[in-house]
Amino acid sequence: MVMLRSLLVSALAALAAASPIAEPADQSLEARQLGSSNDLTNGACKDVTLIFARGSTEMGNMGTVIGPPLCSALKSKLGADKVACQGVGGLYTGGLMQNALPQNTDPGAISTAKSLFEQASTKCPNTQIVAGGYSQGSAVIDNAVQQLSAEVKDKVKGVVFFGFTRNLQDKGQIPNYPKDNVKVFCAMGDLVCDGTLIVTAAHLTYTINAPEAASFLASKVQSA
């Protein structure tokens, strides 16, 4: 375990030190500057609610690599007035060491994400929920969806993962959730997707997948 933790710290330090990937120019000022979005907790109900969990060490509750670009792309697909974007904050700190835990994140992070799904369901009973997670955030969403009640889980129409840390363990899907409603993006050379905790440059390239991921989520909402 000591060796694993040492490897984890040295490998994931690259993520903390890396310069953010350039983001689309049409993102909201809030997302660009703060890496956060609280449309669900602070705003009015929308037709679609995106719940997103950022990667380790990323700023805000949406991060920078893929969270804000995904939100922006989904709003472009479905209409800015139709989509609420909500990042997972609270007890999810995005710390490095949590990646080495059995669920590849900690119980507090999972509980925080789960509560957001439940809030979307109760506060906005007519909203269609979609979700996404990057790096450690993919484990947060994966585990949270598994813990949802059948009623809430049925409202989750689609999930996208980027650099899925549980890709090998969960066979590219979320246990007990429709496989066709999950799309996993694993860049060539991203060893995180192979069941390791080794971060390579490929792990930081997922910004380019925002349009395709948004199209997938939009298709699930529109076909529901």
Swiss-Prot record:
> Which Pfam family, any one of them, does this sequence belong to?
Cutinase
Site for Transition state stabilizer, residues: S56, Q136
Q: What is its main location?
A: secreted
Described by its record, this protein's role is as follows: Catalyzes the hydrolysis of complex carboxylic polyesters found in the cell wall of plants. Degrades cutin, a macromolecule that forms the structure of the plant cuticle.
One GO BP: carbohydrate catabolic process
Active-site annotation:
S135, D190, H203
Molecular function in Gene Ontology = cutinase activity
- InterPro entries per UniProt: AB_hydrolase_fold, Cutinase/axe, CUTINASE_1, CUTINASE_2, Cutinase_monf
Give the family from UniProt. Belongs to the cutinase family.
Q: List the disulfide bonds.
A: C45-C124, C71-C85, C186-C193
Please state what the protein is called.
Answer: Probable cutinase 1
EC assignment: 3.1.1.74
Q: Please give the catalytic activity noted in the UniProt record.
A: cutin + H2O = cutin monomers
The signal peptide, as residue positions, is: 1-18
Recorded coiled-coil stretches: none
Intracellular or extracellular location(s): Secreted
Which terms are listed as keywords in the entry? Disulfide bond, Hydrolase, Secreted, Serine esterase, Signal
Its GO CC terms are: extracellular region
| Species name | Aspergillus flavus (strain ATCC 200026 / FGSC A1120 / IAM 13836 / NRRL 3357 / JCM 12722 / SRRC 167)
Indicate whether Ribonucleoprotein appears among the record's keywords.
Answer: no
